[in-house]
Amino acid sequence: MAHKKAGGSSRNGRDSHGKRLGIKAFGGEHVIPGNIIARQRGTTWHPGLNVGMGTDHTLFAKVEGHVAFRVKTGGRTFVSVLPMTEAAAE
């Protein structure tokens, strides 16, 4: 008994579109409340000061200021927004 699948039945041919993940506002960039800083799957970057996290782990600014990245002990990267008064001082 031959066990050969009938021709013309392709199992390939599926491919999903890119999800446009990554950093949207880089370090030092000016942001306003609600601006998306990073889109991610899981917590590649963690929310720091003045940064909120959505249900899909999207990081967004809570105040107007400049974006700052900081790596803490343990290797976790935290994203913060330094308010305009603090950002001007640095």
Swiss-Prot record:
HAMAP family: Ribosomal_bL27. It comes from Nitrobacter winogradskyi (strain ATCC 25391 / DSM 10237 / CIP 104748 / NCIMB 11846 / Nb-255). Residues 1-21 are annotated as: Disordered. One of its GO terms (molecular function) is structural constituent of ribosome. Belongs to the bacterial ribosomal protein bL27 family. GO terms for biological process: translation. GO terms for cellular component: cytosolic large ribosomal subunit. Keywords: Ribonucleoprotein, Ribosomal protein. This is Large ribosomal subunit protein bL27. PANTHER family: LARGE RIBOSOMAL SUBUNIT PROTEIN BL27M (PTHR15893:SF0), RIBOSOMAL PROTEIN L27 (PTHR15893). InterPro entries: Ribosomal_bL27 (IPR001684), Ribosomal_bL27_CS (IPR018261).
